Structures are given as structure tokens and as C-alpha cells.
Regions:
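Short, exposed beta-strand-loop hairpins at the edges of beta-sheets
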Residues: 174-181
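Amphipathic/hydrophobic helical signal segments and adjacent flexible N-terminal regions
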Residues: 3-104, 109-111, 191-207
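Short, surface-exposed secondary-structure junctions/capping segments
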Residues: 135-150, 199-207
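Short, surface-exposed beta-strand-loop junctions and turns on beta-sheet-rich folds
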Residues: 119-122, 161-164, 183-185
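Short beta-strand-to-coil "C-cap" segments at the C-terminal boundary of structured domains/repeats
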Residues: 169-171, 186-195
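N-terminal glycine/threonine-rich, aromatic-flanked beta-hairpin/loop signature
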Residues: 52, 97-142
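Acidic, glycine-rich flexible loop segments
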Residues: 143-166, 170
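A mature extracytoplasmic/lumenal domain signature
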Residues: 95, 116-118, 160, 181, ...
Length: 207
């Protein structure tokens, strides 16, 4: 890990909310397959499709554009790792610097796939860089991130830093996403139109 890579990562982290405000608003994926994860097997012995049998997904050159890519782990029924929180679903930030951000989280075994803002970050939460995220960030810059499950959290360690820089965990029916110094609360969407009417009413009240 070089000092230059660390500084680059920190600058990108600090400027992330500004970039978020400048880009087009996120739109939720269309299709029930995004909102209804595969039913998982009762135990490892009953697994029909393991997470390791599915090729690692990567961000396409230039990002995936406006149409959400198909779920990566569709059909994978390997039970979640014992220490893993169940973060599966489509989530939208309702409070925090990244309000409006939408992301889809898939899980099976130790594997986690987070799709959002044009990127696909596919990882195995075993604490290694080799099986972590080796891809690009929303700006196109290269990233290398180790992932681990700790005390009900998904912790991410860019360049295998000692402390987690990004964390996701459940808080009741909501998810908390800490991105560096920024804390966001997310609500799970049940359909593409979930929350749209509420937002329209809020906009009308603000006029």
C-alpha cells in the first residue's frame, strides 16, 4: 500500500457527496427479480448452486449506464455465512449526505455484490484483497478493497487499511451505511415505484 494510493482514496472519499449532488438522480431498477432474492437453502448440505460457482462480475467499461444489470447471484441458494447480516435487496438513502442514492445488494455464502451508480462491486468477505473488490469507483479510478463480516456488519477496508472505511449494518428495518465520515440511513424498496408517491407529495408541499 503506497502513500499516494491512500491519499487518492481519501480525497475521493471526502469529495463523494459533492459528486453525488452533481449527477443525475438515481432511478430504481425495473423488474421483480431485483427485489425478490433467490430463496436460500436451509443448510449448506442442501445447496444446489454455490456462490463460488458463479463467475465474478465486474464493472463494464464506462459503467453500466441507465439500465440496471441483471442480478449476479440469481439462482444461487447457498445460505449466508453465520456472521453475515442479511442486507439483500434494493435500498435507497432517505437521510444523510447521499440522500436519493439507490443500491442493490446481493448475498450468498460469504459473497456480496453491491450494484450502484454505474458500478458492480463483487466480493467475498474473507478479509483478503485477492477476493475483495478489485474494480473501479464511480469516477473510473481503480480500487482494491478487502471485505469482512464483523459483529453483524459488512466492513470494507480500502487497500486493506487497518480500520474499516465503509460499513453497512441493519438498524431495525433500515440499513445504516457509513462511508468514511458520512452516515446515511437507507430504506429497503419493495417495488420500482416504492416511495415515489411520498416524494411527489413532499415536493408539492415544498412549492
Amino acid at each position: 500500500m503506497t502513500l499516494r494510493r491512500v491519499l487518492t482514496a481519501l480525497v475521493a472519499l471526502i469529495l463523494a457527496p459533492r459528486r453525488h449532488r452533481r449527477r443525475r438522480p438515481d432511478t430504481p431498477p425495473i423488474g421483480r427479480e431485483h427485489y425478490e432474492p433467490t430463496v436460500l437453502a436451509a443448510d449448506a448440505a442442501s445447496t444446489q448452486v454455490s456462490s463460488d460457482s458463479i463467475p465474478v462480475a465486474t464493472t463494464p467499461k464506462g459503467g453500466w449506464g441507465e439500465a440496471w444489470p441483471a442480478p449476479v447471484l440469481a439462482g444461487c441458494d447457498e445460505p449466508l455465512a453465520d456472521e453475515a447480516p442479511d442486507l439483500r435487496g434494493v435500498w435507497k438513502v432517505v437521510d444523510g449526505p447521499f440522500v436519493g442514492h439507490i443500491e442493490r445488494i446481493e448475498q450468498a455464502g460469504q459473497r456480496v455484490v453491491i450494484t450502484a451508480t454505474g458500478i458492480i462491486h463483487d466480493m467475498v468477505a474473507d478479509g483478503t484483497l485477492e477476493r475483495g473488490v478489485n474494480d473501479v469507483d464511480p469516477t473510473g479510478g481503480a480500487v482494491s478493497v478487502a471485505a469482512r463480516f464483523n459483529d453483524g456488519r459488512l466492513d470494507l477496508f480500502p487497500n486493506n487499511m487497518r480500520r474499516a472505511v465503509v460499513t453497512r449494518y441493519l438498524d431495525g428495518d433500515e440499513m445504516v451505511w457509513r462511508y468514511g465520515p458520512y452516515r446515511n440511513r437507507l430504506r429497503r424498496l419493495e417495488a420500482p415505484t416504492d416511495g415515489v408517491q411520498t416524494e411527489l407529495l413532499k415536493e408539492a408541499d415544498d412549492v
